[in-house]
């Protein structure tokens, strides 16, 4: 009987890559904030209600994206680990 070879390490690495991309969003967020501050006059000047609301909304949106991406990456990694554990259990039972 042939062996089935699953690449659980690749799945785990994919989950880690998703989580790393989520973490990298902070750099993008800060770059956008710098641009928003430079263009503050568009919203009525830095410190204006519209400017502050835009910054708050932007931060909230980035936080939501980060949380969802990080959570998805964790789920992918947990699924990989769970599948690998199940595979080892079944494999040892068949040995």
Swiss-Prot record:
Lineage: superkingdom: Bacteria
Renumbered residue ranges of the record's region Disordered: 72-95
SS bond list: none
Pfam families cross-referenced by the UniProt entry: WXG100
Family named by the database record: Belongs to the WXG100 family.
Protein name: Putative ESAT-6-like protein X
Source species: Mycobacterium leprae (strain TN)
């Amino acid at each position: 009987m042939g062996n089935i070879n699953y690449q659980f390490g690749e799945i785990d690495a994919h989950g880690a890559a998703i989580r790393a991309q989520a973490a990298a969003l902070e750099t993008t967020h800060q770059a956008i904030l710098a641009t928003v501050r430079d263009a503050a006059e568009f919203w009525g000047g830095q410190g204006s209600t519209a400017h502050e609301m835009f910054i708050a909304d932007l931060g909230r949106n980035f936080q939501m994206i980060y949380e969802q991406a990080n959570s998805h990456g964790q789920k992918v990694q947990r699924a990989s680990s769970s599948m690998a554990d199940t595979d080892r259990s079944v494999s040892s039972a068949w040995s």
